[in-house]
């Protein structure tokens, strides 16, 4: 994955963009993947690890109503997380991740469900991926890989 992270840094630097992220189930893995690369300070603004609902509200401005209506693992919350990170960090691009890494989950929100959002000045897009009950480490790795790929695709389609 470092190849993808390196590509992200190279492209963001060329475009003069700053990136931030808001992470729940990945617990800082996206931030770590980006900052593992020398020179990342030129494009990585900061990261937010908002594991609890309270942290999502306090640090990112996620609304209590959205959390109550949709639950933490939802595209609605992922969108508010990304938009809040973008606003708080004053960055150009924000990625957010909220999911159920496991073990656990329910019939309606199964283990392996991860919601993503990507926010920038042009708007916010979100999606849900069902990775399945792969086990906690594998779901978290799949979420990291998918998040980095979303950033890469977005940057490669810009300009």
Model-derived features: positions:
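Short alpha-helical segments enriched in small residues
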Residues: 1-159
């Amino acid at each position: 994955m470092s190849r993808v992270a390196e590509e992200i840094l190279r492209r963001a630097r060329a475009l003069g963009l700053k990136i931030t992220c808001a992470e729940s189930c990945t617990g800082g893995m996206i931030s770590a993947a980006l900052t593992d690369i020398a020179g990342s300070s030129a494009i990585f603004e900061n990261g937010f690890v908002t594991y609890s609902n309270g942290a999502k509200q306090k640090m990112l401005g996620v609304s209590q109503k959205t959390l109550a209506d949709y639950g933490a693992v939802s595209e609605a919350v992922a969108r508010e997380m990304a938009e809040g990170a973008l606003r708080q960090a004053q960055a150009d691009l924000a990625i957010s991740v909220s999911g159920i890494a496991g073990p656990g989950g329910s019939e309606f929100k199964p283990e392996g469900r991860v919601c993503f959002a990507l926010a920038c000045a042009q708007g916010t897009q979100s999606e849900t991926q069902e990775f399945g009950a792969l086990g906690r480490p594998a779901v978290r790795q799949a979420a990291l890989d998918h998040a980095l790929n979303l950033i890469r695709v977005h940057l490669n389609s810009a300009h």
